[in-house]
Amino acid sequence: MDFPREFDVIVVGGGHAGTEAALAAARAGAQTLLLTHNIETLGQMSCNPSIGGIGKGHLVKEVDALGGAMAIATDEAGIQFRILNSSKGPAVRATRVQADRVLYRNAMRARLENQPNLWLFQQAVDDLMVQGDQVVGAVTQIGLRFRARTVVLTAGTFLNGLIHVGLQNYSGGRAGDPPANSLGQRLKELQLPQGRLKTGTPPRIDGRSINYSVLEEQPGDLDPVPVFSFLGKASMHPRQLPCWITHTNARTHEIIRGGLDRSPMYSGVIEGVGPRYCPSIEDKIHRFADKASHQVFLEPEGLNTHEIYPNGVSTSLPFDVQYELIHSLPGLENAHILRPGYAIEYDYFDPRALKSTLETKAISGLFFAGQINGTTGYEEAAAQGLLAGANAALQAQGKEPWVPRRDEAYLGVLVDDLVTRGVTEPYRMFTSRAEYRLSLREDNADLRLTEIGRRLGLVDDVRWDAFSRKRDAVAQEVERLKSTWVNPRVLPAHAAEALLGKAIEREYSLSDLLKRPNVSYEALMQARTDEGELLAGPGVLEDDVLAEQVETQVKYAGYIARQQDEVQKHLSHEQQPIPADIDYDAVTSLSFEVRQKLKTHRPETIGQAARVSGVTPAAISLLLIHLKRLHYGSRKQAA
């Protein structure tokens, strides 16, 4: 039967991409339906119980700045918070959180159930309704037809999912869940370009059987305690727990090598390529044969369970080999395994067949987000989900889409990399992928994106008010530092030497003094004149987050200004559109190879064309000349 109500947006799948897509579409004002095979697993953390990390934390902050739920749910569920690279520059500092799986899932479900314009329905989707080249809805496994103007597909690892433990395998979307084989077959019929990838997970351990006395404890950060969301507070956090560290050894490596003949990866059973930056333990032993030991992080899965996630020993080896390798690790000699590790192989679709909005080029109104696009990680999925959900809603409402630029957001880097370069292995975000990472910091994600989110309808009044207060306070303080001047009479030699290491010889603004590498905002604000008055005067920021933002903006102002100059130079051609119907064969000045690559990738802009592998700067110059001729010819005809 046809469901009696029509929707603007249908989201298929309730993982990290699907939940953010549904929430974003609903926040943008679209009547949204989230279809999931199991409402109980909405927001499920299928693999590791952590969120964030280098590059990944930046994406979570951006999702949060755009009104998304991942960061605030993590603040409510996080049982250990750390800032990675805390001793390095602000561009590469990143938040990483251990999360209680149940608390996180509950936090996400509460937001989904209380989001206006959003309906949930429990049914697996077996088919898409397509008329011509336009998607018009989805069909569930009981034949129920839901109609919508747009559909966002976030199928994760469920499309023709195949789980491997040793040489045995069975169909599944993840352990305990069925695969989406019918939907996978339907997508093949639509002739969208696809491939196979794989990912894996380690065996889980009963913490009561671990000897913690021989392990290294890894506590979270306590002073200050980090928060993930710009609206987060440390008081939201539940009870905190430590992680523990052990190491593999020669015996572990010997056990693994002895089992490689029964490994599905090394016996050719698995065809899909695994993630380079999250390799299985057998892959580590094979690729880094000269390394005597590898770290294994024992991460708690939650406050009300003894289950431990041994991060670093993801494996698809037979269970008897898993059993031996776990018991070879110090502290785990008597460990009880609760669940076996496994690898899962699944279909993904070449993201070069997507527009930068994450809409498929072949089927209007159909958007893809998450692992279906060849990415790995909760954070990458959530970011894509938010963008796809927002753009699906905008399209359903007849509005212009939003495409973040590479200089605007890590989300822009992620999407641009996917749609121009494609993937040959699961894609993971790193800060090194961003050319403009000094401007794309965790701490300024809201200053970069919240105004855009407000314009798109993604940011509510509470977030907007908090952001506006922060933005204005930071701007006022930066301006105050620029306009407040001190001279040798006001800052005598002994005070200057204490603050700066030497006396000042002329007049300086407070901003000039703060730019010096050994001067902090806090020290500058505490400096006093001979009369005992505060050098900085009234108006000092007491909020540490705001003070850090001011210090970063002032200290890096010169570098950021130079980077912005670079951005402006690139933007003139970066955003120049290429006609969708361009005939590359008519651009005879281009080599045959370049013409073939451009015909295959069909880039939407000059910037995208420049990032296609094998397309040289000289070829871009020739393409620009051709586009100018086309433009001149069309103007001449119009006249």
Curated annotation (Swiss-Prot):
Q: Which domain of life is it from?
A: Bacteria
Q: Which cofactor does it need?
A: FAD
Q: Which GO terms describe its cellular component?
A: cytosol
Compartment list: Cytoplasm
Q: Where does it mainly reside? A: cytoplasm
Q: Name one GO molecular function term.
A: flavin adenine dinucleotide binding
Annotated positions binding NAD(+): 274-288
Q: Which PROSITE patterns match?
A: GIDA_1 (PS01280), GIDA_2 (PS01281)
Q: Which GO terms describe its biological process?
A: tRNA methylation; tRNA wobble uridine modification
Task: Please tell me whether the keyword Membrane is annotated for this protein.
Answer: no
Keywords of the record: Cytoplasm, FAD, Flavoprotein, NAD, tRNA processing
Residue positions binding FAD: G13, G14, G15, H16, A17, G18
One Pfam family for this entry, by name?
GIDA
The record's note on quaternary structure and interaction partners says:
Homodimer. Heterotetramer of two MnmE and two MnmG subunits.
Q: What does this protein do?
A: NAD-binding protein involved in the addition of a carboxymethylaminomethyl (cmnm) group at the wobble position (U34) of certain tRNAs, forming tRNA-cmnm(5)s(2)U34.
Family membership noted in the UniProt record: Belongs to the MnmG family.
**Entry's PANTHER family?**
GLUCOSE INHIBITED DIVISION PROTEIN A, PROTEIN MTO1 HOMOLOG, MITOCHONDRIAL
Record-given protein name: tRNA uridine 5-carboxymethylaminomethyl modification enzyme MnmG
- Organism of origin is Bordetella parapertussis (strain 12822 / ATCC BAA-587 / NCTC 13253)
